[in-house]
A protein has these predicted regions:
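A short aromatic-anchored loop/beta-hairpin motif
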Residues: 11-22
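Second-shell residues forming the walls of enzyme active-site clefts
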Residues: 18, 26-38, 43, 53-55, ...
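Short, conserved phosphate-binding/catalytic loop or strand-edge motifs used
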Residues: 102-112
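A charged helix-plus-loop insertion that forms the helical arch/lid used to bind
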Residues: 63-73, 117-119
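Short, acidic/polar
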Residues: 2-12, 77-88, 173-180
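Active-site-adjacent structural elements in enzyme catalytic domains
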Residues: 25-42, 73-93
Length: 238
């Protein structure tokens, strides 16, 4: 029944892509082939593989979490890891990895980022994110930096509520946006925008960054000069 509902989305609504959340590699590859054969325009296939395909698929390789990579001093090892993840993803027909996470983990009470972050230092985060991105993209896997403009210093989970970030624009530009600037300079393919309430960037009360013209168009595209693909975080988040 679930597979049929996806068939209908492809045939009736001409969706542009799919994201896989569970299953094994054989089933995932089979479903990808099924859906691609039904779509008149090739579908983009994405996955959250922050520490490898095993984040979502069983019987696949698992790599260290970003917190561990934050202590690795040899960037070539991180790039090599990204390259392997790229090879494995391409074999599965996956185009986008919704990674790396470039949130700077400056709030120890953060319930959702934590060990998914490279750490609390913006230079450390940016250097490792660039290495991982280069590894992905050397194999033709598009990297997607997230969660723009920065989910690191929040004390609530945006899957369940709308977190508020109270920093002023200068602090956000100096700290949270730093990794994005470095990744964009190095050829980043795509960015995922978070659902956040940031009064210093969006004056409308309770208006999420994911649909904010000022955040997405003025800051990300105009100020940072980003020309790649822009995703929002999941729309089924509360």
């Amino acid at each position: 029944a679930h597979n049929k509902s996806i068939d209908d989305l492809i045939s009736k609504y001409k969706i542009g892509g799919l994201i896989f959340f569970q299953g094994g590699p054989v089933r995932q590859a089979s479903l990808t082939n099924r859906y691609q054969s039904q779509s008149k325009v090739p579908l983009f296939i994405g996955i959250d593989a922050e520490w490898g395909l095993s984040m979502r698929l069983d019987s696949t390789y698992r790599y260290p979490w970003n917190m561990t990579l934050g202590a690795v001093q040899d960037m070539s090892l991180i790039e090599k890891m990204g390259k392997q993840m790229g090879q494995q993803s391409k074999r599965m027909g996956i185009h986008f990895n919704f990674a790396p996470v470039v949130d700077i983990n400056t709030n120890p009470k953060n319930p959702i980022i934590g060990n998914r972050s490279f750490g609390e230092d913006k230079f450390n985060v940016a250097e490792r994110a660039v290495a991982l991105m280069k590894g992905f993209q050397s194999e033709g896997l598009f990297a997607t930096a997230k969660h723009f403009p920065g989910h690191g210093d929040t004390s609530t989970d945006s899957h369940h509520t709308l977190p508020v970030v109270k920093f002023d624009k200068k602090r956000i530009d100096d700290v949270e946006l730093y990794p994005y600037k470095e990744l964009i300079k190095n050829g980043l393919s795509s960015i995922m925008v978070a659902h956040l309430d940031i009064p210093s960037l969006e004056s409308r009360k309770g208006y999420p960054t994911s649909i904010s013209y000022n955040v997405v168009t003025e800051i990300l595209q105009n100020d940072l000069g980003f020309k790649g693909l822009i995703f929002t975080d999941a729309l089924n988040m509360k």
